[in-house]
Amino acid sequence: MEQGGGGGGNEVVEEASPISSRPPANNLEELMRFSAAADDGGLGGGGGGGGGGSASSSSGNRWPREETLALLRIRSDMDSTFRDATLKAPLWEHVSRKLLELGYKRSSKKCKEKFENVQKYYKRTKETRGGRHDGKAYKFFSQLEALNTTPPSSSLDVTPLSVANPILMPSSSSSPFPVFSQPQPQTQTQPPQTHNVSFTPTPPPLPLPSMGPIFTGVTFSSHSSSTASGMGSDDDDDDMDVDQANIAGSSSRKRKRGNRGGGGKMMELFEGLVRQVMQKQAAMQRSFLEALEKREQERLDREEAWKRQEMARLAREHEVMSQERAASASRDAAIISLIQKITGHTIQLPPSLSSQPPPPYQPPPAVTKRVAEPPLSTAQSQSQQPIMAIPQQQILPPPPPSHPHAHQPEQKQQQQPQQEMVMSSEQSSLPSSSRWPKAEILALINLRSGMEPRYQDNVPKGLLWEEISTSMKRMGYNRNAKRCKEKWENINKYYKKVKESNKKRPQDAKTCPYFHRLDLLYRNKVLGSGGGSSTSGLPQDQKQSPVTAMKPPQEGLVNVQQTHGSASTEEEEPIEESPQGTEKKTL
């Protein structure tokens, strides 16, 4: 018997001979179901008799037939309670405890799932039962049919009979298949006794006229088939075991698929929620960044507007300051011209007294202190020393007309502080521009004429022009030595062209405003040197025309005064050519 119980797999293989005696179509279907059940975990051995015992078989995933029948009996007994109760969980706990009393350890959840699977398979079998034989569609069909068709009051009395008959079937049909008949009564004798004992109080309501034919028809359908053929009942048991295995495998697979499907749905749900949260977070981040960019742009716009306002304000202030500076310069120039006109007609001092300024000349130094005192002190110390050398040279020749010309060095000394004051007050905001203002040209002429004796000596001319540039910077004019030299050459060339034209220049000529100044300087050099080596700086026409050279100096003085008195800011015409013959020796 132990060999039959333990080697259930070999005995199932030996069952091929009765199965092969069936019709080909049914044989093929049963073989396919049997192979599927065998692949799921050796279903034939478990369905043969449960040689491992009820306790060991109940702990696995498969439900043996006896355990399933016990579950159906307990569920049938409690059918009315299940129908009336709203909460089913405590009832399934009670079903689990009853199964534990019978020796089957199953949780309430497992019991509920098993019953639902059996009920589902019953409904499916009932729908497709028309094309099959009675009793071969599903081995628990009769029990479930009785459970679903009986009224609630008689369900507790009917189900024990419908369940008790299949339990005794292996003993009645033990002759054809010793594999199922011999191990079951001996190894599991106690559980069937408990079943019979548990259903001893139920026999009184057995004689039911309405349900009698139902039970006989349903319960003994397999017996009728077994009496028709000697091997029929055992084949039905085999088929039901295979069906149970198929149901168990399919239900487990469906359960797995259902669990997997439920998990997939939950995952999809969570993924959707996560996606929504991420999208909202991204949208919030984008809006936050847009707000930051907008605020930054607004701040930049405000800063740009403020900068534009500041630039406009500074431009207005600069314009006002330049206008005020121009007005003050013109006012100072008018005052100086008035003083020059006054002093030019009243001052007649000898050259020896030129170092001691008379009382009428005290106001101009006061004006220079008010306008710009530091550049005046430096310019006077540098300009008075070289200019004093001109009278010393003029004293040497004794010609008679030297007396009228003796006033010219004094007048130049008077004019130089005044010109320096004008230059210091008219310092332009762009001293390094390409155009030279009138005051700057006059300052260059004064500095260059003051260094004429040094230019006559054999000394490097570059150092002298550097000194002139330094003196110009002290006076407020930013000109380098090269620019000063080029400007000096240009004004001498322009003076030569104007002189060669032999046109009578008016006293208020706007072009070449420094003509009279240069003319006066050149005339003084002719008279002082006597036409010697210093005549190289004089133009050719001045050498050839003694009449013009002997022109009275008073006219030149008046021209100089009128030139300084005019407040016009007209500049000289630009000269592109370089001097070719003027002052070769001096430069």
UniProtKB/Swiss-Prot annotation:
Compositional bias annotation for Gly residues: 1-10, 41-54
Comp. bias regions, Low complexity: 173-194, 221-232, 379-395, 411-434
PROSITE patterns per UniProt: MYB_LIKE
Gene Ontology cellular-component terms listed: nucleus
Parts forming coiled coils: 285-328
PANTHER family, sorted: FI21293P1, SI:DKEY-66I24.7
Top-level taxon: Eukaryota
Remaining remarks: Plants overexpressing GTL1 fail to develop root hairs.
SMART domains: SANT (SM00717)
UniProt-recorded name of the protein: Trihelix transcription factor GTL1
GO process annotations (BP): cellular response to water deprivation; DNA-templated transcription; negative regulation of cell growth; negative regulation of DNA endoreduplication; negative regulation of DNA-templated transcription; regulation of cell size; regulation of stomatal complex development; regulation of stomatal complex patterning
Expression sites by tissue: Mostly expressed in siliques, and, to a lower extent, in growing root hairs, leaves, stems, and flowers. Present in abaxial epidermal cells, predominantly in guard cells, pavement cells, and meristemoids.
MF (Gene Ontology): DNA binding; DNA-binding transcription factor activity; sequence-specific DNA binding
Motif (Nuclear localization signal 1): 96-103
One Pfam family this sequence matches: Myb_DNA-bind_4
Subcellular location: Nucleus
Induction: Down-regulated by water stress.
Key words, A-Z: Coiled coil, DNA-binding, Nucleus, Phosphoprotein, Repeat, Repressor, Transcription, Transcription regulation
Extent of motif Nuclear localization signal 2: 472-479
Residue spans of biased composition, Acidic residues class: 233-242
Primary location: nucleus
Biased composition (Polar residues): 538-547, 559-568
Transmembrane segments: none
Domain (Myb-like): residue spans on this chain: 55-119, 434-492
